[in-house]
């Protein structure tokens, strides 16, 4: 939130001066939706709508095969990619095909599905509630794990006729995986391997801007941010991405705005794609979800949402305090990639997480990587993606 406010203030102070600054060639994907971004590079694209048990309608995107293997008959192994906090399906296809995990997996022979969590740009529909109502936004990552993930996985498996899939999560995408697979053995059985990028469970040691949010008293937090959407993806973000961040003089401001959230990594950031990143991010979430992360910073625990009073927790959980999520109960094989310069998924929190995983098959800590490098770094294929493809290939043998 803070980087956006700084950027807006900068525009206000500068007036229309930025119009006279040097222009970088714009990437057309900055003005596209998910299907258009996929098709732009010559890949097949499908959009499906998943209805969760509690009525949310999520757009899920499919790349059924790569550009050059359309005629290969037979089922392809299924991979489901789940974005992180404030992200969307675009996170997996925002770079050139050779640098985007969604495209790389399709070209490697996989049936690729891109998920969206309730409340982001591509998941703002409900059977009964309008996004204008507070009821629509009454959710956190608890509900994403309880409803979104199972509904989406079951939909994908029904559609493809397969019994299991590979699950790749980034950031909050790993969080909901940890919850869902540890609390639902039936769902866990449908996962071949869990590939966790920048994994987040506890955030006791985080150095991200969540620390600043945690300092705001609860009552003041609700006054400032309301009770609906946090960090909406609006015309302003697209304007910043398409117009402002494609100016040579201002692209450094945009880059540092992103790094302020996640940690600095100058050598890996592809400045030529900055307008695409900013145009599609942040994709939004609920204020309640942000409150849940704020609670996690303050408590240092990996637990369900605290409703604020013992009697309220009793109503939801049949106990006066929020239940702790038991990471040791997850038996899904898991491969982990973490970063030593990650302000959100701090190495100390990652170490705690690793100590609780009963079926860890691989771990790699990448020097100088930050939280967003796992989806946008120019060397992500060498550091992460090729290893994911190799591990998945083992399942084919």
Curated annotation (Swiss-Prot):
Its main location: secreted. Disulfide bonds join 245-254. Pfam families: Abhydro_lipase. Inhibited by diethylp-nitrophenyl phosphate but not inhibited by thiol reagents 5,5'-dithiobis(2-nitrobenzoic acid) or 4,4'-dithiopyridine. GO terms for molecular function: triacylglycerol lipase activity. Residues 1-19 form the signal peptide. Keywords: Disulfide bond, Glycoprotein, Hydrolase, Lipid degradation, Lipid metabolism, Secreted, Signal. GO terms for cellular component: extracellular region; intracellular membrane-bounded organelle. It catalyses: a triacylglycerol + H2O = a diacylglycerol + a fatty acid + H(+); 1,2,3-tri-(9Z-octadecenoyl)-glycerol + H2O = 1,2-di-(9Z-octadecenoyl)-sn-glycerol + (9Z)-octadecenoate + H(+); 1,2,3-trioctanoylglycerol + H2O = 1,2-dioctanoyl-sn-glycerol + octanoate + H(+). It is an enzyme of class 3 (hydrolase). The active site is at 171 (nucleophile), 342 (charge relay system), 371 (charge relay system). Catalyzes the hydrolysis of triacylglycerols to yield free fatty acids, diacylglycerol, monoacylglycerol, and glycerol. Shows a preferential hydrolysis at the sn-3 position of triacylglycerol. This is Gastric triacylglycerol lipase. It comes from Bos taurus. The gene is LIPF.
